[in-house]
């Protein structure tokens, strides 16, 4: 047991340091191609690169370990100090991804066939997960790798709607203008705005507004973007119609949309992850998340799915991203124990 732990931690140091050294903000995932080619050769895992998204698929099988290789922007020089590794993506989600790669390698060595994916664009519009759903892939089980503190199993995510609104008006000299597009639209924003308060209540949040071209002329055009979040028990169409009714004189376009997801606590992946943690004397928690993940998309190609991963979720997207190699080991062990159970019952 101790020998296996040291092997996993040593391999994690090597692989995670390599991957953190490669800058892969969304849409730049091809930077990691040589890394995945090396993994494929070293671990004897077949490599497929999805052509449209540049997502990486390793191995074969009916069970998928799915994480993502892209990060938010902002490179952080990786370093290791006292069994802690720092760098952009250490938590979200290169740490979970490396845990999955090591788990897949060890499982395949035991004859348990598992696929692992480093999907693209999760931090943007999830084109990697979307491409996977369009390629006729279907899996008996999927575990999504996102930081969940090494103890939490995510069974629910909210959905999102990204809305662009374009408004127009007659420009006037600002010294004598009778109307102002900025003022008029600002009033409507305040009326439709729903502050994020709790999970079950939807939020409608303006995130971008652009208008005006001259210091002394009221704007002729205004661009506005809303980020809408809603739980599975909220009515999507009601939210869209509420915004449409408020901005009747403007054009509205849905530029991206992700459905909410909620899975039964009795689905096989949830139960196997729960038992895997209990076997390590770790008390699992079933949680729901206010954001979205690739789980929202990948629910289309399986009936058994949940999200779990090592890493402190409070450090996601911060300049303090770090993860310990003990956390990585717990992640590897949890994935392996869960998949061994799922494999035996298949």
Curated annotation (Swiss-Prot):
<feature type="binding site">
    <location>
        <position position="68"/>
    </location>
    <ligand>
        <name>Zn(2+) 1</name>
    </ligand>
</feature>
<dbReference type="GO" id="GO:0008270">
    <property type="term" value="F:zinc ion binding"/>
</dbReference>
<comment type="pathway">
    <text>Amino-acid biosynthesis; L-arginine biosynthesis.</text>
</comment>
<dbReference type="GO" id="GO:0006526">
    <property type="term" value="P:L-arginine biosynthetic process"/>
</dbReference>
<feature type="binding site">
    <location>
        <position position="123"/>
    </location>
    <ligand>
        <name>Zn(2+) 2</name>
    </ligand>
</feature>
<keyword id="KW-0862">Zinc</keyword>
<dbReference type="GO" id="GO:0005737">
    <property type="term" value="C:cytoplasm"/>
</dbReference>
<keyword id="KW-0963">Cytoplasm</keyword>
<feature type="active site" description="Proton acceptor">
    <location>
        <position position="122"/>
    </location>
</feature>
<dbReference type="GO" id="GO:0042450">
    <property type="term" value="P:arginine biosynthetic process via ornithine"/>
</dbReference>
<dbReference type="GO" id="GO:0050897">
    <property type="term" value="F:cobalt ion binding"/>
</dbReference>
<dbReference type="Pfam" id="PF01546">
    <property type="entry name" value="Peptidase_M20"/>
</dbReference>
<feature type="binding site">
    <location>
        <position position="146"/>
    </location>
    <ligand>
        <name>Zn(2+) 1</name>
    </ligand>
</feature>
<keyword id="KW-0028">Amino-acid biosynthesis</keyword>
<keyword id="KW-0170">Cobalt</keyword>
<dbReference type="InterPro" id="IPR011650">
    <property type="entry name" value="Peptidase_M20_dimer"/>
</dbReference>
<feature type="binding site">
    <location>
        <position position="317"/>
    </location>
    <ligand>
        <name>Zn(2+) 2</name>
    </ligand>
</feature>
<dbReference type="InterPro" id="IPR001261">
    <property type="entry name" value="ArgE/DapE_CS"/>
</dbReference>
<dbReference type="InterPro" id="IPR050072">
    <property type="entry name" value="Peptidase_M20A"/>
</dbReference>
<keyword id="KW-0457">Lysine biosynthesis</keyword>
<comment type="function">
    <text>Catalyzes the release of L-lysine from [LysW]-gamma-L-lysine and the release of L-ornithine from [LysW]-L-ornithine.</text>
</comment>
<protein>
    <recommendedName>
        <fullName>[LysW]-lysine/[LysW]-ornithine hydrolase</fullName>
        <ecNumber>3.5.1.130</ecNumber>
        <ecNumber>3.5.1.132</ecNumber>
    </recommendedName>
</protein>
<dbReference type="GO" id="GO:0019878">
    <property type="term" value="P:lysine biosynthetic process via aminoadipic acid"/>
</dbReference>
<keyword id="KW-0378">Hydrolase</keyword>
<dbReference type="InterPro" id="IPR002933">
    <property type="entry name" value="Peptidase_M20"/>
</dbReference>
<comment type="pathway">
    <text>Amino-acid biosynthesis; L-lysine biosynthesis via AAA pathway; L-lysine from L-alpha-aminoadipate (Thermus route): step 5/5.</text>
</comment>
<comment type="similarity">
    <text>Belongs to the peptidase M20A family. LysK subfamily.</text>
</comment>
<dbReference type="Pfam" id="PF07687">
    <property type="entry name" value="M20_dimer"/>
</dbReference>
<dbReference type="InterPro" id="IPR010175">
    <property type="entry name" value="LysK"/>
</dbReference>
<feature type="binding site">
    <location>
        <position position="92"/>
    </location>
    <ligand>
        <name>Zn(2+) 1</name>
    </ligand>
</feature>
<feature type="active site">
    <location>
        <position position="70"/>
    </location>
</feature>
<keyword id="KW-0055">Arginine biosynthesis</keyword>
<dbReference type="InterPro" id="IPR036264">
    <property type="entry name" value="Bact_exopeptidase_dim_dom"/>
</dbReference>
<dbReference type="GO" id="GO:0016811">
    <property type="term" value="F:hydrolase activity, acting on carbon-nitrogen (but not peptide) bonds, in linear amides"/>
</dbReference>
<feature type="binding site">
    <location>
        <position position="92"/>
    </location>
    <ligand>
        <name>Zn(2+) 2</name>
    </ligand>
</feature>
<keyword id="KW-0479">Metal-binding</keyword>
